[in-house]
Swiss-Prot record:
GO terms for biological process: defense response to bacterium; defense response to fungus; killing of cells of another organism; regulation of defense response to virus. The modification Leucine amide is found at L21. Belongs to the frog skin active peptide (FSAP) family. Brevinin subfamily. The keyword Secreted applies. Coiled coil: none annotated. Expressed by the skin glands. One of its GO terms (cellular component) is extracellular region. This is Brevinin-2-related peptide. It is found in: Secreted. Keywords: Amidation, Amphibian defense peptide, Antibiotic, Antimicrobial, Antiviral protein, Cytolysis, Fungicide, Hemolysis, Secreted. Antimicrobial peptide with activity against Gram-negative and Gram-positive bacteria (MIC=13 uM against E.coli, MIC=25 uM against S.aureus) and fungi (MIC=25 uM against C.albicans). Also shows hemolytic activity (HC(50)=50 uM). In vitro, shows moderate inhibitory activity against HIV. It comes from the Eukaryota.
Length: 21
């Protein structure tokens, strides 16, 4: 569903932020 897509994008986004720390 739409929420699964949003959650997946959130995980990817969070991963990118952590890599930039």
């Amino acid at each position: 569903g739409i929420w699964d897509t949003i959650k997946s994008m959130g995980k990817v986004f969070a991963g990118k932020i952590l890599q930039n720390l």
